[in-house]
Amino acid sequence: MIIVGNGNCGVNFFLSFNKEHFTKKKLLKYIDGMSRTDFLIDHLEYGSFVKDDLKQIFNFNVLRGKSDYKYILKQITRTSLKVKKPDIILLDNWGDMNFTAWKCKKTNRRIWICNQEKREDYLNNYKQFIEDFDKCGYLSYEQSIENYKKLIKHYRRNNPNCPVIFINIYTQLWKKDYHRNFYEKIPYDLQKIIPNFFIGYVDKNKLKTHNGKPGLHFTKENYQEMFNNLKEQGFNYNLLNK
């Protein structure tokens, strides 16, 4: 089975806590995380930065040892786009919900700097950076919808009916992203216009974080409920035996 997609904690925990369903056969997973949808769409036209480019932009001496170090590197992976014929497309909405971006004036390539408001110390030369990049801010809801449509179309280019599973990220237990909670509607709007599209959702009243603290990582039971709720939407479980 080949799974492709764009996602982060939602996708990863969904697979981890439902692994008995996805590992009946050999599983090949190509998930590009820590990227917004526009980063992937842009790659098809402009390419992407590589690690050596990031070394010129970011101060890795400051970053090394921090979680943001590996996350910043992950934002340039594009393995999912190369897969010719996936069996399942797996997405979540956290990247578009969370990241603000900067766009390179010369190459039109985009990156994010960090999760915090200001981390100038992450950059080798902040003054040079703001001369070379334009601040894009957040994606709008409408931009995100269009990007998901384009991304799914690309993934489906050789398998037009490839099912999409979209893991919904809920913000009610994480105040930092609550101002972007309207992104929870995205999978429902996409489902109206994209066939063979399934939503990994859970009853919000049952939401609990895995460690009892504020966050976006939920319990095993929550992710298992997301899987079980696919069936009522018509998801063909026989695909998981492929």
Regions picked out by a protein language model, each given a short descriptive name:
Residues 1-242:
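Extracellular glycan-modifying ectodomains
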